[in-house]
Amino acid sequence: MDKILEAVVTSSYPVSVKQGLVRRVLEAARQPLEREQCLALLALGARLYVGGAEELPRRVGCQLLHVAGRHHPDVFAEFFSARRVLRLLQGGAGPPGPRALACVQLGLQLLPEGPAADEVFALLRREVLRTVCERPGPAACAQVARLLARHPRCVPDGPHRLLFCQQLVRCLGRFRCPAEGEEGAVEFLEQAQQVSGLLAQLWRAQPAAILPCLKELFAVISCAEEEPPSSALASVVQHLPLELMDGVVRNLSNDDSVTDSQMLTAISRMIDWVSWPLGKNIDKWIIALLKGLAAVKKFSILIEVSLTKIEKVFSKLLYPIVRGAALSVLKYMLLTFQHSHEAFHLLLPHIPPMVASLVKEDSNSGTSCLEQLAELVHCMVFRFPGFPDLYEPVMEAIKDLHVPNEDRIKQLLGQDAWTSQKSELAGFYPRLMAKSDTGKIGLINLGNTCYVNSILQALFMASDFRHCVLRLTENNSQPLMTKLQWLFGFLEHSQRPAISPENFLSASWTPWFSPGTQQDCSEYLKYLLDRLHEEEKTGTRICQKLKQSSSPSPPEEPPAPSSTSVEKMFGGKIVTRICCLCCLNVSSREEAFTDLSLAFPPPERCRRRRLGSVMRPTEDITARELPPPTSAQGPGRVGPRRQRKHCITEDTPPTSLYIEGLDSKEAGGQSSQEERIEREEEGKEERTEKEEVGEEEESTRGEGEREKEEEVEEEEEKVEKETEKEAEQEKEEDSLGAGTHPDAAIPSGERTCGSEGSRSVLDLVNYFLSPEKLTAENRYYCESCASLQDAEKVVELSQGPCYLILTLLRFSFDLRTMRRRKILDDVSIPLLLRLPLAGGRGQAYDLCSVVVHSGVSSESGHYYCYAREGAARPAASLGTADRPEPENQWYLFNDTRVSFSSFESVSNVTSFFPKDTAYVLFYRQRPREGPEAELGSSRVRTEPTLHKDLMEAISKDNILYLQEQEKEARSRAAYISALPTSPHWGRGFDEDKDEDEGSPGGCNPAGGNGGDFHRLVF
């Protein structure tokens, strides 16, 4: 029968005839047969199935095996012995073909259980291991995977299983797509997926095999062979548990046995896996490894791989199936390559055609990719400005796409930079500390120079002034301003966690200061602003003279001198009027100022509540102007009339002295308070005008005005009750003992008044603007009277500055003790301050910086600075407490240490640390509402373009810093491997050395961080 069937199959009969004859033979084979006849049919079936050149013989062979196996199981068990299986697998040279493996799989399906089956499975466990060690092709390897997936008893056991998994990884690395075209590619992908699926199945059964397989995978991709391994290895990544990622990357990046060339080769080949269409989580592993390399400061590898692979990754955005992974890797590579524009500029020629292709695609995936690509381009243009000729085609291509705001751009640039990655060695070696999570850069303390650092950070955070300095065109006539520009440029764009202001400090040194000793930061600020102002004036005059001397035309009338940068940003004007009380003659003098020095009222004024500092609870009412006084007020009550300018002459109309603010103790509701205050500003100004008219026509008041007077009395009574209640509570606290009172903890300082008279900045400003009697030894020389006379001096603000600087005069000379002392009173700081200007106008100011002095003497202690971006934005968009807007995000600058903070911390610093008191305050003028204000705000928020020399210097220093960090990491890596995970002696490098003294800051050469940083000196 077997001879007949073989002759039919090999004959030249038509296929239909052959099929009919085959059916008859198969029907006969279902009947009882002799053993020899059945074995002959089985041998023919195996021969046709494995060696058939056409489809019909293979199908006939398969049918024969099925029929014989089902109807003659005993004979089939005898035929499908271990010897027969071994002959099938070793029948040819090299690894067995996929048909032989398929025949074995078919035989296993038909093989009955028994000793013969056990012997076959034992043989197959050895043979499949031998097979994968011979590196079969994708088809045979996929057949092995199908065989083992269907018959798990064939999987090698014991130690051979791990070896089998590792050899499967090696096989995947040798895969090559055998056919061209879509069908061949799809088949190749399916084969790779089957093999990787088998690996995943084995890993689930034996998780301990995962890490050795990963080690084998790295050995494959890091070997510098002539022929790179197949991208089919990417199919393995999708089955790796993400929980292992951090540990694997950390161990790999810190492994001393892995050379740089191996790591470079491995990461380069992993990035090529982005083109693998079915790879899940490939981008996550690539990014994790890049972050791991950044953490151990292997920047040379990162630079090389970024420059060689970024264009290839970018090209994959064309293909939707791999677009997501490619875009993730591209974003990370660009956003981390911030030390130089080289990587971004490699992509510039490719961006416009890519945008055109994505627009033409018109799909959800393409649209999303376009938006993210445009955002990425805007970030890079923001980071590397100054190349308009290169950027113009790119900006033209994305002009119709969404433009991210500056806050979003800074957020993206700040979160992924290489220098922001946490170093594995940072806990032991502070030189490797990463850039602050805030994205801000600290200043190194050069030995009691915290007073300089605090002022410089406050000036830098005044965004309008910073932009003005950065926009300065390089001018040899302004050397100090140029040095400040370079300092600000590095604070804005450096990758270092902290830089040294040594060069700028030496140029701006105050002559009467002693080097190495603590100085008054307010005194330094005044000197610095004056130097900058005079330098710019002198430079402008020199330029004008040079221009006139070089002009052939007759000299024209010199133009009026323009305002300097200091005048524009910090300059205001104040009018002082002195009225002789004898002849009522008034002398006026207008002066320019850059800061206001606010003295503390004498102790007897502590209990008095001036109108501007009277605050109601936030939930009841915000600070607002009260109506005019009534005649019913007794002598013991401080009425609103006392808060108004006295009418000196008819030419000097009265000016209201109200000051509005948000009490710092109510910081939790700061956003809602600002919104309510802004909504009431317009109404307040109208009420001010009405009050002044009402005061001049006091005799004609009607019934409605008397009702207002009653409201005033009720409001003042409430305030007095609140004051009495606070006093009672503080008396109860005092009764607990002197040791529990804050005053008792600071014997070396002095307080001018108790907590009953707790002050606000509003009180100090009111005291500054209140009329002053010039009597006795302080009498005024009146030119009209030609003699010394009693007089009254009144101070008014005639023009408010863009940035209002307030200095609280805490240091005074005590004639009794003959030494300088510090006033340690806690002064509450309003977030929003409204100052009166001459003519009845008012101007709102937002708090943006607070310089704090820690200590009891001006000759000692420490300075640090709280600040936020001094950029204007309507109060309604200040954000929430959980997620503040960037303009509402406070930072603490403590020399090299920069951290996130809050207005609540600013408000409560003195209550927690009684020696730490606010000293210098920066307020930014709030623009008036309307279209002009919005245009002005957007203009101010545009980041300036740095000139070429400065950008090149920053880029070179960033590269130098990366090299320094890499060198330092390499020199330390050999030691860190032998250290315990969390040694006690390794803690505290990033802690403040002065915290045990009850202060948030320390004054040591490394500043609040106490670390030894690589120092960039200007």
From Swiss-Prot:
<dbReference type="GO" id="GO:0006508">
    <property type="term" value="P:proteolysis"/>
</dbReference>
<feature type="region of interest" description="Disordered">
    <location>
        <begin position="544"/>
        <end position="566"/>
    </location>
</feature>
<keyword id="KW-0378">Hydrolase</keyword>
<dbReference type="InterPro" id="IPR018200">
    <property type="entry name" value="USP_CS"/>
</dbReference>
<feature type="region of interest" description="Disordered">
    <location>
        <begin position="610"/>
        <end position="757"/>
    </location>
</feature>
<dbReference type="Pfam" id="PF21246">
    <property type="entry name" value="Usp38-like_N"/>
</dbReference>
<dbReference type="InterPro" id="IPR049407">
    <property type="entry name" value="Usp38-like_N"/>
</dbReference>
<keyword id="KW-0597">Phosphoprotein</keyword>
<dbReference type="GO" id="GO:0005739">
    <property type="term" value="C:mitochondrion"/>
</dbReference>
<feature type="modified residue" description="Phosphoserine">
    <location>
        <position position="613"/>
    </location>
</feature>
<comment type="subunit">
    <text>Homodimer (via C-terminal region). Interacts with HSP90AA1.</text>
</comment>
<keyword id="KW-0832">Ubl conjugation</keyword>
<keyword id="KW-0963">Cytoplasm</keyword>
<comment type="function">
    <text>Deubiquitinase that plays a role in different processes including cell cycle regulation, mitophagy or endoplasmic reticulum stress. Inhibits TNFalpha-induced NF-kappa-B activation through stabilizing TNIP2 protein via deubiquitination. Plays an essential role during mitosis by deubiquitinating and thereby regulating the levels of Aurora B/AURKB protein. In addition, regulates the protein levels of other key component of the chromosomal passenger complex (CPC) such as survivin/BIRC5 or Borealin/CDCA8 by enhancing their stability.</text>
</comment>
<keyword id="KW-0496">Mitochondrion</keyword>
<dbReference type="GO" id="GO:0004843">
    <property type="term" value="F:cysteine-type deubiquitinase activity"/>
</dbReference>
<feature type="active site" description="Nucleophile">
    <location>
        <position position="450"/>
    </location>
</feature>
<dbReference type="InterPro" id="IPR038765">
    <property type="entry name" value="Papain-like_cys_pep_sf"/>
</dbReference>
<dbReference type="Pfam" id="PF00443">
    <property type="entry name" value="UCH"/>
</dbReference>
<protein>
    <recommendedName>
        <fullName>Ubiquitin carboxyl-terminal hydrolase 35</fullName>
        <ecNumber>3.4.19.12</ecNumber>
    </recommendedName>
</protein>
<dbReference type="InterPro" id="IPR050164">
    <property type="entry name" value="Peptidase_C19"/>
</dbReference>
<feature type="compositionally biased region" description="Basic and acidic residues">
    <location>
        <begin position="718"/>
        <end position="728"/>
    </location>
</feature>
<keyword id="KW-0645">Protease</keyword>
<dbReference type="InterPro" id="IPR028889">
    <property type="entry name" value="USP_dom"/>
</dbReference>
<comment type="similarity">
    <text>Belongs to the peptidase C19 family.</text>
</comment>
<dbReference type="GO" id="GO:0016579">
    <property type="term" value="P:protein deubiquitination"/>
</dbReference>
<feature type="compositionally biased region" description="Basic and acidic residues">
    <location>
        <begin position="673"/>
        <end position="691"/>
    </location>
</feature>
<dbReference type="GO" id="GO:0005634">
    <property type="term" value="C:nucleus"/>
</dbReference>
<dbReference type="InterPro" id="IPR016024">
    <property type="entry name" value="ARM-type_fold"/>
</dbReference>
<feature type="compositionally biased region" description="Gly residues">
    <location>
        <begin position="999"/>
        <end position="1011"/>
    </location>
</feature>
<feature type="domain" description="USP">
    <location>
        <begin position="441"/>
        <end position="926"/>
    </location>
</feature>
<keyword id="KW-0833">Ubl conjugation pathway</keyword>
<dbReference type="GO" id="GO:0031647">
    <property type="term" value="P:regulation of protein stability"/>
</dbReference>
<dbReference type="GO" id="GO:0005829">
    <property type="term" value="C:cytosol"/>
</dbReference>
<feature type="compositionally biased region" description="Pro residues">
    <location>
        <begin position="552"/>
        <end position="561"/>
    </location>
</feature>
<feature type="compositionally biased region" description="Basic and acidic residues">
    <location>
        <begin position="699"/>
        <end position="709"/>
    </location>
</feature>
<dbReference type="InterPro" id="IPR001394">
    <property type="entry name" value="Peptidase_C19_UCH"/>
</dbReference>
<keyword id="KW-0788">Thiol protease</keyword>
<feature type="region of interest" description="Disordered">
    <location>
        <begin position="984"/>
        <end position="1011"/>
    </location>
</feature>
<feature type="active site" description="Proton acceptor">
    <location>
        <position position="862"/>
    </location>
</feature>
